[in-house]
Amino acid sequence: MKTELCLFDRTLNLQRYPKRAQELLQAWDAGDEFIIKHVEEELNLEDNKNILILNDNFGALSCWFSEKHNVTMMTDSFVSQRGTLKNLQRNQCNRVQLISSTEEMPEGFDLVIMQIPKNNRMLAWQLQQLRQSMTAECPIIAVNKAKEIHSSTLEVFEDYLGETKTSLAWKKHRLVFSNANATNPLTIAEAVCWSVDNEDIDLLNYPNVYSGERLDQGARFMLEHIPVDAELRHIIDLGCGNGVLSVKAAQLNPEARITCIDESFMAVESARRNLEVNLGKERQFQFIANNCLDGFKKHSSYLVLCNPPFHQGQAVTDHIAWQMFCDAKHILCKEGKLLVIGNRHLDYDDKLCRLFGEENVTTIASNSKFVILEAVKAEKSK
């Protein structure tokens, strides 16, 4: 896998995070190259400009522009933030200010660079923040694959930010040029709230949380199969999203300590709010933005609930699910359980059988779209 980004007689060594022995995916894409090429060839920026970068996947843009400018990188991804930091260190770059999506968007920038997020609600939210924080003179340059930039995408820019135009395609990517000059911009609420049908659960979702305006079918199916057990002293919701599984687990197991983990800062904050509103602040809850279960002690949990993602940023991949399963096995107590839901076509049962042993994996429930699997950590497992 290529790890060296070479442009304008300069080379950066860039790697994805977490680092894998046989990495198949690159830490940057042609969109990163397109933005670098445009800024270097067309903008003629003087040194020491203040640049805001949104959604830098693994720090390619932050590493590049930090050489001559004052860079702030804002992201909703703990993994992207940690990957950016590692690449900055790897290339001995100048300091970059790293901030999360749940912090207030800073002001006073000369240029904004943006990787367009997959989630349209997140896009609208970020554009609204830019409209409120940036001057009309500040250029805002966004990038995505050409096939992902539709007329509706440009309408979102115009509705929430201001005047917008696009570039020609280059290496299957296009740039979007905009300014914060809309006179009557649309507005979007910071969060969406709703109640779960047939459950005593009220939910709030911040903009980048999966299934933002209703409960997704997989989570609804999983709610029906969360166990009740007085011995469950510590339950981990791995990839917690808005925390709906944690809320249900806490309702069913009032003595259990609940830990919500996600790599999305907005997901973690949604889960925090939802557990505290539905169950009160007196319960033992913990909320962590993390790369899976990094740093957790061995034999520290009795049950792990897991609804794995099958993408990282724009890339479709199953390595996150595998890492989640491996981490869960490591931190489970003897006879502890991993409860997993996934689409039937993802074949999670094969992965779990390899990891836990075929005799320790059971199908708990299934329907035409989803399957719920239980993997038990055997008494003799390491």
Curated annotation (Swiss-Prot):
Main location: cytoplasm
Keywords: Cytoplasm, Methyltransferase, rRNA processing, S-adenosyl-L-methionine, Transferase
Protein location: Cytoplasm
An MF annotation (GO) of this entry: 23S rRNA (guanine(1835)-N(2))-methyltransferase activity
UniProt superkingdom: Bacteria
Gene3D superfamilies in alphabetical order: Vaccinia Virus protein VP39
Cellular compartments per GO CC: cytoplasm
Catalytic activity, reaction form: guanosine(1835) in 23S rRNA + S-adenosyl-L-methionine = N(2)-methylguanosine(1835) in 23S rRNA + S-adenosyl-L-homocysteine + H(+)
Pfam families: MTS
SUPFAM superfamilies in the cross-refs: S-adenosyl-L-methionine-dependent methyltransferases
HAMAP family xrefs: 23SrRNA_methyltr_G (MF_01859)
Function text: Specifically methylates the guanine in position 1835 (m2G1835) of 23S rRNA.
Family note: Belongs to the methyltransferase superfamily. RlmG family.
Protein name: Ribosomal RNA large subunit methyltransferase G
Record lineage: Bacteria, Pseudomonadati, Pseudomonadota, Gammaproteobacteria, Vibrionales
